[in-house]
Amino acid sequence: MAYTRSKIVDLVDGKIDPDTLHQMLSTPKDPERFVTYVEILQERMPWDDKIILPLGPKLFIVQQKVSKKWTVRCECGHDFCDWKDNWKLSARVHVRDTPQKMEEIYPRLMAPTPSWQVIREYFCPECGTLHDVEAPTPWYPVIHDFSPDIEGFYQEWLGLPVPERADA
């Protein structure tokens, strides 16, 4: 079932009714939905570079207009790093690793024990948007969420040509 552009706008804005949302999530995707979704996001960005793949509500892999280089970018326009790198290593990080810091977000007796678990909050260094939160053991390295197979996604799933990339 193909959804109207206005329904996808409602989805992006978080204004879609629960029944339609459930139906959208549980049924096969219509072929043009991703393109429409990206067009809607693109219109809302303060920059002209092409969105290749949304990574989160305000985090994207983009193709820089002039160089054709792919980077991870915040909605505000801050480029974190090359698309293949872990963007979290270029983010501003707040680590909650003391009882006092944990109690800022948890009730006292419900907070994790900092010697067993820390909370890492990853922010855009330019606009301060919170992009991700991890809750690993204190010694665990920064988690690289995933490395998308953009070529496979575009060619095999969407049936679209892969956008040009400078380092391809």
Curated annotation (Swiss-Prot):
Entries under InterPro entries matching the protein: Aceto_COase_bsu/gsu
GO molecular function, one term: ATP binding
Domain of life: Bacteria
UniProtKB keywords: ATP-binding, Ligase, Nucleotide-binding
Activity vs pH: Optimum pH is 7.6.
EC number: 6.4.1.6
Cofactor(s) this protein requires: Fe cation; Mg(2+); Zn(2+)
Cofactor note: Zn(2+). The heterohexamer contains tightly bound iron, manganese and zinc ions.
Keyword field contains Ligase: yes
Catalyzed reaction equations: acetone + hydrogencarbonate + 2 ATP + 3 H2O = acetoacetate + 2 AMP + 4 phosphate + 4 H(+)
UniProt-listed GO biological process terms: cellular detoxification of acetone
Enzyme class, first EC level, given as a word: ligase
Function: Catalyzes the carboxylation of acetone to form acetoacetate. Has a reduced activity on butanone, and no activity on 2-pentatone, 3-pentatone, 2-hexanone, chloroacetone, pyruvate, phosphoenolpyruvate, acetaldehyde, propionaldehyde and propylene oxide.
Known partners and oligomeric status: Heterohexamer of two alpha, two beta and two gamma subunits.
Descriptive protein name: Acetone carboxylase gamma subunit
Organism listed in the record: Xanthobacter autotrophicus (strain ATCC BAA-1158 / Py2)
